[in-house]
Swiss-Prot record:
Subunit and interaction comment: Part of the 50S ribosomal subunit.
Gene Ontology terms: cellular component: ribonucleoprotein complex; ribosome
Presence of the UniProt keyword Acetylation in the record: no
Name of the protein this chain belongs to: Large ribosomal subunit protein uL24
InterPro entries: KOW, Rib_uL2_dom2, Ribosomal_uL24, Ribosomal_uL24_CS, Ribosomal_uL24_KOW, Translation_prot_SH3-like_sf
Stated role: One of two assembly initiator proteins, it binds directly to the 5'-end of the 23S rRNA, where it nucleates assembly of the 50S subunit.
Superkingdom of origin: Bacteria
GO terms (BP aspect): translation
Keyword Glycoprotein in annotation: no
Gene of this entry: rplX
Entry's family note: Belongs to the universal ribosomal protein uL24 family.
Keywords, comma-separated and alphabetical: Ribonucleoprotein, Ribosomal protein, RNA-binding, rRNA-binding
Amino acid sequence: MPSKKDTTPKFHKLHVKTGDTVQVIAGKDKGKVGEVIKALPQLSKVIVKGVNIKTKHVKPQQEGESGRIVTQEAPIHSSNVMLYSTKQNVASRVCYTFTAEGKKVRKLKKTGEILDN
């Protein structure tokens, strides 16, 4: 009997969360720094404020209304961003450590700065 294809969505572990400050390390916006607006774990992508801006031409919806050109951020792959320390202005990889209370937190490898409070 053939097995059914698994149609449940896969969630990938992302190293960034909504609200993190990141630096783009690859692509046309390389070097730009911005805040993560939204994380999309099913696609392994993130939306970063001010990065990967796309223009969309919107048709008029009602009679008498004129069309518009809307600019908005498009998702970029999470592997193309790196966490950024605003205190020391440096991008760093992330590692996971435990606090004295036993809570698992994210820590920047270069600076030792703890991200999760």
